[in-house]
Amino acid sequence: MFTFIQKIIFPNYKFALILTFIFTLLILVGTLSPLPQKIYAPGSDKWHHFIAFAVLTYPMVAANKRLGFAIVLFGLCLGAGIEIIQPYVNRFGNFNDFKAGCIGIFLGYFSGKLAYRKNKRHHLMTASR
């Protein structure tokens, strides 16, 4: 169990790529699945956008810091594209959803960067023993 958690927190490149692909599919299905009618739900879905895009960005940056710019750009384009397409699938395109996604992207980026540094430092310390 602990090694699986470690693998998620400090993913290698291959596992990070798999996670990013899965999260991308989940975000696309969750945000672009056509609804039979528009739903007016109380509350805020901004937290969902924030968390989804933080989770999307984190693994690739935690696996390889050089991929940070690419995954941030990918997340921004994905978020913008979703908000543009949503009105065509009986959803609401909302700039505030995009802003929440952007904040999530940057949180995922900085969290991934910290995890990458910690993992790299841990490997350097164990290799020198």
How should these model regions be labeled?
Residues 40-46, 79-103:
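Interfacial helix-loop-helix junctions of multi-pass membrane proteins
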Residues 33-34, 65, 90, 116:
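Short helix-capping/hinge motifs at transmembrane helix termini and TM-loop junctions
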Residues 1-58, 75:
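"…centered on the first transmembrane helix and the immediately adjacent amphipathic helix/loop
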